[in-house]
Amino acid sequence: MISVIKSLLTLSVLSTLAAAKFESATPPIEVVGNKFYYSNNGTQFLLRGIAYQQDTSGSVSNGYDSDPNRKYNDPLADADACKRDVQYFIDTNTNTLRVYGIDPDKDHEECMKIFSDAGIYVIADLSEPTVSVNRINPEWNLDLYERYTKVIDNMQEYSNVLGFFAGNEVTNNRTNTDASPFVKAAVRDMKKYIKDNDYRTIPVGYSSNDDEDTRVAIADYFACGSLDDRADFFGINMYEWCGRSTFATSGYKDRTEDFKNLTIPIFFSEYGCNEVSPRVFQEVGTLYSDQMTDVWSGGIVYMYYEEANHYGLVSLNGDRVSTLADYNNYKSAIKSISPSLARRSTIQSEDSTKTMACPDNSHSTWRASTELPPTPDEEFCDCISQSFNCVVADDVDAEDYSTLFGEVCGYIDCGDISANGNTGEYGGFSFCSDKDRLSYVLNQYYHDQNERADACDFAGSASINDNASASTSCSAAGGRGLQSGRRSSTTRGGSSSSRSSSSSSSSSTGSGSSNAGIKVGGGQMSTVKLITITTIVTAFVGGLSIIFY
């Protein structure tokens, strides 16, 4: 009992320290069991949302955008637009906006205040079009960690931040379920970051597509495990109800049955099929009816602005907004709902912390490991990199790294810099920057060749580091460590020198064929090493799969 009282007092103190702006107008939303509640009165919160961002083609439903020049419009940094649009949200009883890309270097206070005064919350994606987990070659690395934490730092002070998405449709079919451990690691680390910085508790979740093969397994995957690791909520981009339909024939009944036992809130993170135009939004009445509200927490209509995809509720000509038929139909539908709302006081204590078993990853449709990638650790990467005697030359362009990775990994085992979401094997240096990872393997090769002068050249792409520090031991968060300086080619920890278990996810050649070799630059390279190289190289060529057979 004493420990419980101490915990409650600690939470009370932290709550006081982490008081957010605009709480009187928009009290923080909290997660209890499988529902959202207003923190001030314990009434259930159902999302009545609209997706709010122009030109989101690079951040919506693509999972990853390799175009480094793509720009995105941050709608929460444009106060004039927020003032212009807020009345259209008020008129549709909107209480949630989904924003797909936040610029963490911009100020968002004026827009957040405008929306708070209107009782509107924001749920924001932590990624942006070119900085997100790539479903083809997934990583959870320092660049992503820095991007995600900067968004949290920028937005955490506003009480009307409902939550953050750590990913959107990253895994979108059975062929890329290995990407999910990297997104779940992002969920885990962002929850810990929020807690470690004494920010108020802000939910972190995931937004998925509605893929028939993976829809149930991926929801269970993000909801399973410890409270520290699991997602706080789960969104599904749902486009099954088109035109006029019913709860039973649309697929909504089946989906409600699929997720009735999910232990975290689930909602439509996008909805509004446009196969029939204009959209009549008949599904709105069902979504907020007793048939669904015990399982579902509402939804977010896709989308506010009319774009080439014709999902818009309004059109924009210069700064002039014109409502479309979709807007008027949605307005009529959403203003007609009268949902029954649950009360937090009725939730049993054991239900509020209930978790679930993780899905079996031995099936062909779900292969994601429950072992998650390590937390990116900048100090660890810096510690190791300072000891490299051979490094990539500063004048080598990042787009040329793939060629060097392919060459050097033909000579040595690159397990320490690679990661496999199917087997749950993550090299101890896999989360560091591309430049540091390349220098790591160049340095390893240099020492394996007994520091021959020509072993640190690679046609001028590598050079001797005269300022290398003395060999020392570096440890990463969670106890992972690597020996800096000179080291053998045998990998450490969970990564065996043969990397034999890594082949199961990308090739039918197993350990029995690991001795088969291919000559590369005068060296013998095993088939298993070849698979590792393929995984590394494809990360630098925008999704092009390179097969060396």
Curated annotation (Swiss-Prot):
Bridged cysteine pairs (disulfide): C82-C111, C224-C358, C242-C273, C381-C432, C390-C456, C409-C414
Pfam families given in the database record: Glyco_hydro_72 (PF03198), X8 (PF07983)
Top-rank taxon: Eukaryota
Sorted UniProt keywords: Cell membrane, Disulfide bond, Glycoprotein, GPI-anchor, Lipoprotein, Membrane, Signal
Keyword Protease: no
Glycosylation sites: N41, N173, N261, N467
Secretion signal, residue range per the UniProt entry: 1-20
GO molecular function, one term: 1,3-beta-glucanosyltransferase activity
Membrane-crossing residue ranges in chain numbering: none
Residues covered by region (Disordered): 470-518
GO BP field: fungal-type cell wall (1->3)-beta-D-glucan biosynthetic process; fungal-type cell wall organization
Subcellular localization: Cell membrane
Lipid bilayer topology: Lipid-anchor; GPI-anchor
Repeat listed as a keyword: no
Annotated Gene Ontology cellular component terms: plasma membrane; side of membrane
Feature: compositional bias, Low complexity: 484-514
Family membership noted in the UniProt record: Belongs to the glycosyl hydrolase 72 family.
Annotated protein name in UniProt: Protein EPD2
